[in-house]
Amino acid sequence: MCIRDSTKIVGLHENGTVIDMLRVKAEDPLTSLYGALGNFLATHSLKLTDIGHIALTGVGASYVDGDIYGVRTIKVEEFPSVGVGGLALSRKERAVVVSMGTGTSLLWAEKGGEIRHIIGSGIGGGTLSGLSELITGVHQYALIRKLCQDGDLSQIDLTIGDMSKGKVGTLPPEATAANFAKLAEDATSADKMRGLVNLVLQAIGTMSVLACRTCGTNTVVLTGALTMLPPAHETFELFTQLYGVEYIIPENATFATAIGAALYSMREDG
């Protein structure tokens, strides 16, 4: 389980294959944790005695002391969970793995080897939510996802093409020169939301390129809730074109940390 403002729970068979995944949101970490566990057991007609062990990760894991309902409970540090989960879902041997959650963390991960924290940033989903409420009055993630789809970036961002008739060095006309520097008077809430999403995703993209240069790789695995934003693929594709970095958003990327915690605990447990 990955416990933050919501709990993501993943059940695995002994061979590491996934049984199911679900997400439960509640007012506090313990309520979401026990709600997620109860929901999962009921959905799959399982008993507590059917569980070999429970692996916890995420900041909310600190609220749990001892075993849960008498089931052996293991706490796994979040960074190894992110690294193992990102590699498992992407089927890569090594990569920079990015966790795009409330904030952003960038890790270097090697399968069966080193997993280390490269750097982190306070820019992430929390930034998007806070600025979104300030600027548009919307902070719910589902509404942010919906609203940004209809936005027009040309109403918000200044591009190379706005300032030059051609390329500037290797930068094409559509590349962003300055976020929010072209804010139009008639910009809609959707336009502003699209600009906010672009600001956050581009900041993460820039950090990931620098992390790749540091680690000597060109492979980035993206995980976390922000991977579900509709413009994510388009934004990171531009980074691929500009810097030759391969961005992978694997299936079930939002559950990467929970999956990684389960796999890591099974590996450490022998």
Annotate each language-model stretch with its function.
Residues T7-H13, T104-A109:
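Short beta-strand scaffold segments in enzyme catalytic cores
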Residues R72-F79, E237-I259:
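Conserved phosphate-binding/catalytic loops in two-lobed NTP-binding clefts
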